[in-house]
Amino acid sequence: MKLTDFYYDLPKELIAQHPAEPRDHARLMLYDRQTGAVEHKYFYDLVDELHEGDVLVFNDSHPTGGKVEVLLLTPVGDDRWEVLVKPGKKALPGTVIEFPEGLTGTVEDRTDFGGRIIKFAYEGDFDAIIDKIGEMPLPPYIHEKMEDPDEYQTVYANERGSAAAPTAGLHFTEELLQKIRDKGAEEVFVTLHVGLGTFRPVEEENIEDHQMHSEFYSITPEAAATINKAKAEGRRVIAVGTTSIRTLESAGTTGTLQAGSGWTNIFIYPGFTFHIVDALVTNFHLPESTLLMLISALSTREKILKAYEIAVQEKYRFFSFGDAMFIH
């Protein structure tokens, strides 16, 4: 398939610069993945679309907020992180970067995608230092500075290590999550640390030639057992966000979800066979992006682009701080 097959025209004024307030008052497009039929709701109506026994799978990764000299992407162990450094030409292996609050970082190696591996040295709590000296990394289409960094955190974020928030989860409030529990749906948490690939555009004309950047994921035995039980009983597994769907399909290629951790560069596009996920909660994605290709795989490219055309006509808000779709 060609990259241009996934192009659509989006007026810039529809790119959301701030999240809805309250979070669950964003709009929600209900999308039937078989027929392409759409309905227009609000996100707080999602609970009405859920069934008792549904399992919602959330990504609990937590953006690091570390953009001063470097952009923290993914922790790789022993106080080492994969990072992007600007300007990169000054970050040769062996370079020591000094930060405020007594934090230093030594560049140890280059990565395949233009990043670096840095080992940090510090006294005290690393997370607290980063929170104090860093700023939240935002997508390049967000031009306004956040007043409150919590705007770019899910209410359930727990595992620090992402370069960006799993943004479909931004719409959930504690109150909505409680209503979902009261409905009889279950919630399960997995972890995928969103990395460099989130910001990397597709450059190959044939999308099959695109190579995804690897990202770290983790699935607990308890999470895998809950999801496998639901699959065996014919209950729906609903991924909240494309990061959750990539985690589940990476570890579920046999139809049974495997607990554990590892790295995935899974690239989901039309023709992909889903083994775990039945439905998806997601935002509206960039033209010609891997995420638009992913949701097209859940339905068809033509039907998804038609839904996006309707979203533009109805003035839905797009991208990370924008409105949502429930693809079911």
Regions found by a protein language model. Give the residues of each.
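Surface-exposed, charge/polar-rich loops and edge strands
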Residues: M1-H328
